[in-house]
Amino acid sequence: MTKIGLFYGTQTGNTETIAELIQKEMGGDSVVDMMDISQADVDDFRQYSCLIIGCPTWNVGELQSDWEGFYDQLDEIDFNGKKVAYFGAGDQVGYADNFQDAMGILEEKISGLGGKTVGFWPTAGYDFDESKAVKNGKFVGLALDEDNQPELTELRVKTWVSEIKPILQS
């Protein structure tokens, strides 16, 4: 079985908690290696053919600071042939004009470098105005809102993982 690399950035701890839940649902640390992007380097990405990328949207539609610091280094990674799933944490009420933008920014960059995006997620059940993470009517990955819909996180993660697990493990 192919081991999966899960790279996340976190400011308040929410994205790390979600990453741990995803790792558990995927089958634990024997299936998924978790790495805080603040501790990662480009070589860490190179050892995986399947990736899960997690980033909260920070401030007004910006990348979380550790992802912002790593962003230019993404250019040094060959994503061709890599399957990449995304998840993000955001606030759809307080930041309705840029809900999940960070997830969209990372997906656009990585897909532009050859990554194959998997794990699109429906926009139904959310109330926002705009998002850079929406393509063809769906989020480019799992959109979570710990501020306004924390009670939906566990079910959303379980549902999403059940969809991406067979794709990432094939």
UniProtKB/Swiss-Prot annotation:
Record Pfam families: Flavodoxin_1
Gene3D superfamilies tied to this protein: 3.40.50.360
Disulfide cysteine pairs (residue numbers): none
Cofactor: FMN
The Flavodoxin-like domain, residue ranges: 4-165
Matching InterPro entries: Flavodoxin, Flavodoxin/NO_synth, Flavodoxin_CS, Flavodoxin_lc, Flavoprotein-like_sf
GO molecular function terms attached to this record: electron transfer activity; FMN binding
Record keywords: Electron transport, Flavoprotein, FMN, Transport
SUPFAM superfamilies: Flavoproteins
Family affiliation: Belongs to the flavodoxin family.
Protein's job: Low-potential electron donor to a number of redox enzymes.
Listed name of the protein: Flavodoxin
Designated gene of the protein: isiB
